[in-house]
């Protein structure tokens, strides 16, 4: 009947196989359990959850069909099958626990070869064979098959680890299996697989939990001629899944007889993978059309086995029947010819069946060669032992003694009876010479075995697997009765080996031995690598079933460990025991793709505690403690006993066990366990030592395999306690029988951002030159400028264009980041420019000599553009300046003037701090660029036109300009202003600049206070002839030392001239001293001299001593003589106060000894004067605010009497009157509009009201002059007001001060005020209607103007004055310098 899937119907239901002959009436709601095998660890694979979990097919069907599961398109349902029936749930108890399952190894019914097309392997048509119905019924009665679908079976306990179950569980399973008969489905009409099943409907999603049957066995469509419709329909997966092993029965199409197959021998080889190409399909060759093959596009390899079937048959028949196979477990390997794929190579097919000991006379083996390299039917593993990633080491090897007959054809070459091992032959195919072609071609006929009187053995179909050609396989054929195994390491290959048809073979029934077999007999007949104990007839079925199950567990564990060690091939180790004579021991390696396990399932199955395992692992630990014995093997493949430590001890007493020492709580992933073994560890030597010690399983790299064998075979308990860390080792532990190769460093992932040390040898010439240039620029200073510049030019930085540009970038970046040395870097650019210009001129001359005189004359007649082209063509053009200016232009265009001052409002406090820091760095770089451009203009490397363009763009905005632009404009103008002012054409631009600046200053609402002061400073700088108060440029050490020495000399010669604004008492002290710190002696004599104020006397503590007073006064007289002149009043005072024992000293100022004595006496009185000044300062601080308010009130009310009354009431002592006078003068200079009122108030207070004496007035204006540095710092243009106020004091009728006093007072603060003092002189002269009158005043009083200038300006006083104002020229024409 045809099964057709209807995509529009309800979710897919399993096909119900109509068994007309034997319908067992199993209910529809029967829940099929997976095969009872607890030794396999479930591969960790999750499936996508379906749209509706209820729609996913929960499990196997109700009927006990034993058809192997398949992968590929979903088979169709037979007509009449109810698709609307409810779907039973699968394992509702624990839906999230993956359950191990394995395909049932029940023979499938052969199909007609005409039922499928070679060109469409995906649409498999399975046809039943009705004549074979009776044989199936007979087989059911003869053999007891595994009741994998019986609804009364014991519930399958889900296992989450690879440990074996308990003995009680196994006994229950085996009893149940022995009591239930197997069932083989009836043959039926072919199943039409249509292309619609390639993409299933949406309702067939993936389960929300992993399906055990789909996890373990990748579902594939049946083979073209031997397939059966699957009992459990597998939802077509939308994504590729991992390969899963499956089992199919092979039926000979010619005789319709099952080819009996046996399990392969346990392979001690390394892990070899036999990948198969996706192109191996039934349509690839005619040969595949006649044999079973994997459908194209599946990409999976399937192994077949029927070992469990034979065991069940043996148990039903009550006889021990080890399935015999070809004498040498023949494997033939020949490379496939490119012309025809009909003759292809089938690799890694080994034959061996676990069986009980048999009699010698009843065993025979045959080997049949095939023209097309036929793989014998007995070359497969058991259903669970066939994995796609690791080899199986669980089956037993059938051996024959000398009396055993062996039949081979003469065409087969006999291999040498020597065990050989080939290690690591990458990508080396098996040569065709390994199997000689038959001399006499034999017809491909099945060799049937003669049946005996015993019940005939049911034939099993041989399983053929399309094998990937990845590792090479060794062929082993036998012609002698005594055979040695031939083992060759397998390496990966890339070619495809198509599947060839299988020959028929009949086996002779084996007579059951009456007596139990002894150890010696077992050694000569059956070798079990898991145990060397003798077995009896009573335990034959249990041992065989356990051995078959063990293969599953070992294969599962190999999959488990293969994940962590996919890059390493485990070296095959030979298994040679003195008491064992194996007849055959061939390499067998299942092929396929590795299974990828999800991290979630791995973590869920791992025990929570390494000391106390929980769940099934705890049961496993209890079983180990009670069921192990001395001969038991641990998970590392070593015996557990008193001498276990000695067995693991290597040379030098070192424990060479890979799992020693146990790592407590070290949860490493599988990739890190034993990935890098001990340095001197030789796996082969260690393997031989273990082999000599009687451990045939030393090469078992599956940790759970030994426990499984020991528990099932009932070994006595061991003497040692199990390792508490074994559960973790069972999960993650990986034991190798060879030294894994450490991967090369180049294969490791590389971080692109890692730091890599620079290798000088790897640099080219230009990079080396740039490195040297950078070293020089890091060391360059103004002091070493000339030397290092020469070294830089000698590197040839102008020869190579790359080096040329790189050097410019280095200089440019340093100039912007180190603005203090900007002048030095511009000088360096000038040097390089001149050097390049000279070098190019020399090269140009050489070019002219080559081209001749005529061409040279033509060159001079060319235009500038043509000359540039000529120079560029002959590489004689200087390009340094062009590249430098281009770099400046690019950097200037990058300045974000609009956003550099803006701070986003939505920033957090910490983000705002970082943003402001970034703004500060950006502003610093902008100002460095502006300064660099200005310095380049001063070096004449930048044209004036470019500078004007920049300045216009910065200040030319009509509306409120950006403050950052105005700041850049002020900095640039302060640098280039002096150079521009010397050009008459630029004076027009400067005039317009200052007019715009004045407009900005006057409009206080548009700009902040800081920017307005900054603009005012530039305007004052222009008025001061562009002379900076502080030179911020870099200086040499000599220049710094000279400046410091000069300042020190000034402090020593004129201590009152030192600016000290932190303490006003020092200013007050300095205002009264001309030669020493004594103050009050200047006040006392005038007070005594003033007859109009007899009541005012100085306090007692201010009474002067004779020596300091005379010294101070004499110093004053000397200064007056220096400027030439003085008034009569001071001359009269000279006679009155030049008295005492030391009076003669005043007439001789050249006596150094006397000067030193006077200085010492002055220093003795400094302490008392400082204490007095401190008290005065405290008093003034208390009343200064009241005085300031009184002055402001006077300016509003203009009431002199009121002001005077306030002063008398607020100021408790006359000692504070000089501070009041200083405050009045400071107010007059600050408020030019109120200057006449302040001057009128001062005159009235001194002369009319007599509030202040003349001496107090002198002390007051001297105190004001000492504060001029602070005034000029705040108001650079205050010199005009100062000159105007003092002009009134000097030229008034009463004569408050003389011209000499005026000159002496301002000379003291020359060093602190800088260029402001000459400006005060110039403005003072300009106050006269005629400068000539001012000159006459200076000449009459013998006052010179040199005291207003520094020494370096003596030579250019007249030039400075005329540049300030041309009206000053008549004055300097009269006054002789």
Swiss-Prot record:
Role played: Probable component of the protein complex eIF4F, which is involved in the recognition of the mRNA cap, ATP-dependent unwinding of 5'-terminal secondary structure and recruitment of mRNA to the ribosome.
Lineage, opening ranks: Eukaryota, Amoebozoa, Evosea, Eumycetozoa, Dictyostelia
Location of the region described as Disordered in the Swiss-Prot/TrEMBL record: 1-189, 259-563, 683-702, 1041-1063
Give the compositionally biased regions (Pro residues).
95-110
Q: GO cellular component annotations, sorted alphabetically?
A: cytoplasm; eukaryotic translation initiation factor 4F complex
Composition bias, Polar residues: 297-323, 517-526, 1053-1063
Name of the molecule in the record: Eukaryotic translation initiation factor 4 gamma
Q: Where is the composition biased (Low complexity)?
A: 1-57, 84-94, 111-137, 168-179, 267-296, 326-412, 533-549
């Amino acid at each position: 009947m045809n099964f057709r899937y209807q995509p529009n119907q309800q979710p897919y239901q399993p096909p119900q196989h109509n068994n007309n002959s034997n319908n067992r009436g199993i209910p529809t709601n029967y829940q099929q359990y997976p095969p009872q095998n607890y030794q396999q660890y479930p591969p960790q694979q999750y499936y996508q959850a379906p749209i509706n979990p209820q729609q996913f097919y929960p499990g196997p069907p109700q009927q006990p069909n034993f058809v192997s599961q398949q992968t590929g398109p979903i088979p169709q349902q037979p007509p009449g099958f109810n698709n609307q029936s409810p779907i039973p749930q699968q394992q509702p108890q624990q839906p999230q626990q993956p359950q191990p399952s394995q395909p049932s190894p029940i023979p499938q019914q052969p199909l007609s070869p005409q039922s499928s097309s070679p060109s469409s392997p995906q649409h498999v048509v399975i046809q039943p064979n009705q004549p074979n119905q009776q044989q199936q019924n007979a087989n059911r009665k003869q053999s007891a098959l595994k009741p994998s679908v019986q609804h009364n079976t014991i519930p399958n306990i889900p296992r989450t680890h690879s440990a074996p179950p308990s003995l009680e569980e196994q006994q229950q399973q085996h009893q149940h299996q022995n009591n239930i008969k197997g069932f083989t489905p009836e043959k039926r009409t072919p199943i039409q697989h249509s292309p619609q099943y390639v993409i299933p409907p949406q309702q067939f999603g993936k389960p929300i939990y992993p399906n055990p049957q789909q996890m373990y066995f990748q579902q594939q469509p049946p083979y073209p001629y031997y397939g059966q419709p699957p009992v459990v329909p597998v939802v077509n997966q939308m994504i590729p899944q991992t390969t899963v092993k499956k089992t199919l029965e092979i039926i000979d199409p010619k005789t319709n007889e099952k080819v009996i197959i046996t399990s392969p021998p346990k392979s001690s080889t390394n892990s070899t993978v036999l990948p198969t190409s996706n192109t191996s399909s039934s349509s690839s060759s005619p040969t595949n059309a006649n044999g079973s093959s994997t459908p194209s596009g599946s990409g999976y390899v399937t192994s077949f086995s029927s070992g469990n079937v034979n065991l069940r048959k043996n148990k039903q028949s009550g006889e021990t029947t080890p399935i015999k196979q070809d004498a040498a477990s023949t494997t033939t390997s020949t490379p496939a010819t490119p012309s025809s794929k009909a003759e292809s190579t089938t690799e890694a097919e080994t034959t061996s069946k676990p069986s009980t000991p048999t009699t010698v006379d009843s065993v025979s083996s045959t080997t049949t060669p095939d023209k097309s390299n036929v793989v014998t039917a007995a070359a497969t593993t058991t259903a669970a032992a066939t994995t796609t990633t690791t080899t199986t080491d669980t089956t037993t090897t059938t051996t024959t003694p000398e009396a055993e007959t062996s039949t081979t054809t003469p065409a087969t070459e006999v291999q040498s009876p020597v065990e050989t091992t080939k290690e690591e032959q990458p990508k080396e195919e098996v040569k065709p010479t390994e199997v000689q072609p038959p001399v006499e071609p034999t017809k491909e006929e099945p060799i049937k075995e003669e049946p005996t009187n015993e019940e005939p053995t049911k034939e099993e179909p041989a399983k053929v697997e399309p094998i990937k050609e990845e590792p090479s396989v060794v062929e082993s054929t036998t012609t002698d009765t005594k055979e040695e195994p031939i083992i060759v390491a397998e390496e990966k290959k890339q070619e495809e080996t198509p599947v060839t048809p299988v020959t028929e073979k009949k086996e002779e029934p084996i007579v059951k031995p009456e007596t139990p077999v002894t150890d010696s007999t077992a050694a000569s007949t059956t070798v079990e690598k898991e145990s060397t104990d003798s077995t009896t007839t009573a335990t034959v079925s249990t041992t065989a079933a356990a051995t078959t199950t063990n293969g599953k567990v070992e294969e599962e564990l190999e999959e488990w460990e293969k994940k962590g060690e996919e890059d390493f091939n485990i070296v095959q180790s030979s298994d040679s025991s003195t008491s064992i004579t194996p007849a055959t021991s061939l390499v067998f390696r299942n092929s396929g793709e590795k299974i990828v396990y999800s991290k979630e399932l791995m973590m869920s199955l791992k025990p929570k505690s390494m000391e106390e395992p929980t769940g099934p692992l705890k049961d496993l630990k209890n079983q180990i403690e009670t069921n192990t014995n001395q001969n038991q093997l641990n998970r590392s493949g070593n015996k557990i006993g008193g001498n276990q430590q000695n067995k693991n001890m290597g040379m030098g007493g070192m424990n060479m066990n890979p799992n020693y020492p146990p790592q407590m709580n070290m949860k490493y992933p599988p990739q890190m366990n034993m990935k890098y073994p001990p340095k001197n560890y030789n796996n082969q030597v260690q393997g031989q030592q273990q082999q000599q010690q009687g451990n045939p399983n030393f090469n078992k790299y599956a940790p759970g395999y030994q426990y499984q064998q020991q528990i099932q075979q009932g070994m006595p308990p061991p003497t040692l306690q199990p390792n508490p860390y074994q559960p973790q080792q069972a999960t993650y532990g990986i034991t190798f029988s060879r030294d894994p190769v450490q991967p090369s460093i180049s294969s490791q992932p590389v971080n692109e951002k890692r730091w890599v040390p620079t290798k000088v040898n790897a640099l080219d010439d230009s990079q080396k030159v740039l490195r040297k240039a950078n070293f020089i620029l890091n060391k360059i200073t103004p002091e070493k400028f000339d030397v290092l510049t020469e070294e830089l030019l000698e590197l040839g930085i102008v020869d190579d264009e790359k080096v040329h540009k790189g050097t410019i970038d280095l200089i440019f970046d340093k100039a912007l980041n180190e603005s203090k040395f900007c002048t030095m870097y511009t000088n360096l650019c000038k040097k390089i420019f001149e050097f390049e210009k000279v070098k190019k001129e020399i090269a140009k001359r050489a070019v002219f000599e080559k081209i001749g005189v005529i061409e040279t004359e033509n060159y001079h007649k060319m235009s500038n553009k043509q000359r540039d082209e000529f120079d560029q063509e002959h590489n004689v053009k200087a390009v340094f300046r062009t590249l430098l200016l281009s770099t400046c232009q690019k950097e200037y265009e990058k300045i974000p003037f609009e956003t550099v001052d803006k701070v986003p409002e939505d920033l957090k406090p910490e983000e705002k701090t970082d943003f402001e820091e970034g703004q500060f760095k950006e502003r610093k770089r902008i100002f460095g660029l502006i300064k660099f451009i200005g310095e380049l203009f001063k070096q004449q490397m930048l044209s004036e036109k470019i500078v004007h363009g920049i300045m216009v763009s910065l200040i030319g905005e009509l509306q409120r300009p950006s403050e950052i632009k105005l700041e850049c404009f002020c900095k640039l103008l302060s640098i280039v202003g002096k150079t521009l002012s010397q050009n008459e054409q630029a004076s027009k631009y400067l005039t317009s600049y200052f007019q715009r600046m004045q407009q900005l200053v006057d409009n206080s609402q548009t700009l902040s206070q800081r920017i307005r002061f900054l603009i005012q400073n530039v305007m004052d700088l222009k008025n001061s002839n562009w002379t900076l108060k502080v030179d911020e440029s870099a200086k040499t050490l000599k220049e710094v030392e000279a400046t410091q020495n000069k300042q020190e000399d000034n402090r020593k010669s004129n201590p009152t001239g030192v600016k000290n604004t932190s303490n006003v008492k020092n200013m007050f002290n300095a205002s009264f001293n001309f030669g020493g710190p004594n103050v009050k002696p200047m006040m006392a004599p005038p007070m005594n001299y003033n007859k109009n104020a007899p009541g005012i006397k100085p306090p007692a503590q201010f009474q002067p001593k004779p020596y300091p007073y005379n010294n101070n006064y004499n110093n004053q007289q000397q200064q007056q003589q220096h400027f030439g002149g003085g008034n009569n009043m001071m001359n009269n005072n000279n006679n009155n106060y030049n008295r005492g024992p030391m009076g003669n000293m005043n007439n001789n100022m050249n006596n150094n000894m006397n000067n030193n004595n006077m200085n010492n006496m002055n220093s003795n009185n400094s302490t008392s004067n400082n204490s007095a000044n401190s008290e005065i300062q405290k008093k003034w601080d208390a009343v200064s605010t009241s005085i300031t308010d009184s002055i402001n009130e006077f300016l509003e009310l203009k009431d002199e009497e009121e002001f005077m009354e306030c002063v008398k009431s607020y100021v408790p002592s006359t000692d504070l009157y000089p501070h009041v006078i200083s405050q009045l003068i400071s107010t007059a200079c600050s408020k030019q509009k109120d200057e006449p009122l302040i001057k009128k108030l001062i005159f009235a207070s001194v002369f009319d009201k007599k509030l202040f004496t003349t001496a107090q007035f002198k002390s007051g204006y001297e105190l004001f002059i000492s504060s001029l540095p602070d005034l000029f710092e705040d108001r650079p243009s205050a010199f005009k007001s100062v000159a105007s106020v003092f002009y009134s004091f000097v030229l008034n009728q009463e004569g408050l001060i003389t011209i000499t006093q005026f000159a002496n007072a301002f000379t003291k603060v020359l060093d602190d005020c800088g260029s402001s003092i000459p400006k005060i002189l110039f403005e003072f002269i300009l106050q006269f209607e005629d400068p000539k009158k001012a000159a006459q005043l200076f000449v009459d009083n013998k006052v010179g103007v040199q005291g207003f200038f520094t020494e370096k300006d003596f030579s250019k006083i007249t030039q400075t004055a005329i540049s300030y104002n041309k009206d000053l020229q008549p004055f300097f024409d009269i006054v002789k310098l």
